[in-house]
Structures are given as C-alpha cells and as structure tokens.
C-alpha cells in the first residue's frame, strides 16, 4: 500500500468512526455529564442510578426510577392513583392551566406530580411519597397535597415510618389559595404522625424550594438530602437584592445546609437504600414477618 493509499484509508476510517459515534449519540447511547462534561455510556449511567461515575453528579430521575431504587422488588403498592387535578379558578397566564395539565399528563403518564404508596425497604414496611419534577416543576397543588396527606394518615393508622422524596419548585400558583392551604394540611397530618411516635424522613433532592421547603420538607425527625441539591425558599437573586449582600457560592446547597444544621445527613443516591435500612432498624422498625 502506497503512502497516499494509507492516508486515504485513514481518512475513511476516521470519517466512518465519526458517523457511527454521531449516530450512537443520536440514538441515545451516549450522554454528556452537565457537571464535568465527561462523555458517558448511557447504559453505565443508568446502572449507576444516574450518577456520573467521574464526578459524582446526581442527574435528575423520575418518580418511577426513584421508587425502583428505594423499594424492594415488586413491593410497592400505589395509593390514590385515581386522583386527578381540576382547574377551579379557570386560571390562565400565557397559557390556560387546563392546557398545562394536559401537556404534563401526556408527557409524563402521570395524573399529577406525586406518586404515593406503601412498600418495603430491606423487607421493612415503609410509606413512600415521591414527587416528580417533570410534572409542572413538581409544584404542589391540591391533588399533590391530598395524596400526601392521605398517605401520612395511612402511615399513622398502620404505624408505618414515612419517607417523602421532595423535588419541587413550590406551591402551584395556578390554584391560588387551594395550593397554599396544602402546606398547613400536610403539616397537621405530620403532627399527628409525630404524636403517634412514628418516624418521618424527608429526602431533599434537586431542587426543593418554595412552599414545600416551608412546610413538610423541613418537618422531619431526620432530614436527608442528596449531594449538591438546591434547597431553599426564595431564589438566590431575590435574597441578594433584598439583603444587598453577596451570598456564598455554595449557599442553598445541601452541603451548606448540613454545615449550618438544617440537614442531618447527605446520602449519595447509590447508598440510599442501604442507609434507609440502617436508619429504620436504628429506630426500632423490623422486617415484615412472612
């Protein structure tokens, strides 16, 4: 083979390799970590609970994926699946609230932004609620509040520990006061759960903000968080403009809140289930007898 033919073959191989790589990326085989820009094989990412193996960045996951990570296989039994939101105010901003609901329901396959149910974690019964940020930013409307309240009441009646996975932009403005009153309703149900001397653990994921932070996200016996999760009430820019001060770079992160006593423990996603089992046993909960 002449030198010219060798270079021609090399160029062809490089071109074909580039086409194959672009095709694989288009098919969703590869992804790029938003934190460290490392190119990762999507299958490896999924097998690692959507956590980047290079930098540990926790990518956002949906409620179904979260339940699979937490609950023992085939143990999750959903509750109140029939509840669906309505548009009591006929609210419309740039778009009608009813249209936003239909779009979110179509894209997520959910009726609203939380999945509730009872499961087992390392064979220990647990009441579990998982918010899903895909559904209108995980906002808390009347159905989200009602489903969480009913789950808390079920946990109280059945003497179950409770875990709520928070991922929310706050109260759903399109429902006005009906949304805001969910804060008090859920808090009241949690107080009755506490009076029954039962364990409640919120898990704060990225992001947990607004009315959710101002209510049930901060009422736990043990407040857990994922690494680098954004946790706060008002936005950083609003606070800086109000105080006229520059805030620390890590302000409103899980690590900042841990340092200042607002969070009890930061748990990497890959260690969550094992850690939950340990915490439940430390608080006297035992495996369900067969």
UniProtKB/Swiss-Prot annotation:
Its EC number is 2.1.3.15. It catalyses: N(6)-carboxybiotinyl-L-lysyl-[protein] + acetyl-CoA = N(6)-biotinyl-L-lysyl-[protein] + malonyl-CoA. Pfam families: Carboxyl_trans (PF01039), Zn_ribbon_ACC (PF17848). InterPro entries: AcCoA_carboxyl_beta (IPR034733), Acetyl_CoA_COase_Trfase_b_su (IPR000438), ClpP/crotonase-like_dom_sf (IPR029045), COA_CT_N (IPR011762), Znf-ACC (IPR041010). GO terms for biological process: fatty acid biosynthetic process; malonyl-CoA biosynthetic process. Pathway: Lipid metabolism; malonyl-CoA biosynthesis; malonyl-CoA from acetyl-CoA: step 1/1. A zinc finger (C4-type) spans 33-55. GO terms for cellular component: acetyl-CoA carboxylase complex. GO terms for molecular function: acetyl-CoA carboxylase activity; ATP binding; carboxyl- or carbamoyltransferase activity; zinc ion binding. Its main location: cytoplasm. Keywords: ATP-binding, Cytoplasm, Fatty acid biosynthesis, Fatty acid metabolism, Lipid biosynthesis, Lipid metabolism, Metal-binding, Nucleotide-binding, Transferase, Zinc, Zinc-finger. Residues 29-290 form the CoA carboxyltransferase N-terminal domain. The keyword Lipid metabolism applies. SUPFAM superfamilies: ClpP/crotonase. Zn(2+) binds at residues 33, 36, 52, 55. It is found in: Cytoplasm. Acetyl-CoA carboxylase is a heterohexamer composed of biotin carboxyl carrier protein (AccB), biotin carboxylase (AccC) and two subunits each of ACCase subunit alpha (AccA) and ACCase subunit beta (AccD). Component of the acetyl coenzyme A carboxylase (ACC) complex. Biotin carboxylase (BC) catalyzes the carboxylation of biotin on its carrier protein (BCCP) and then the CO(2) group is transferred by the transcarboxylase to acetyl-CoA to form malonyl-CoA. Belongs to the AccD/PCCB family. This is Acetyl-coenzyme A carboxylase carboxyl transferase subunit beta. It comes from Prochlorococcus marinus (strain MIT 9211). The gene is accD.
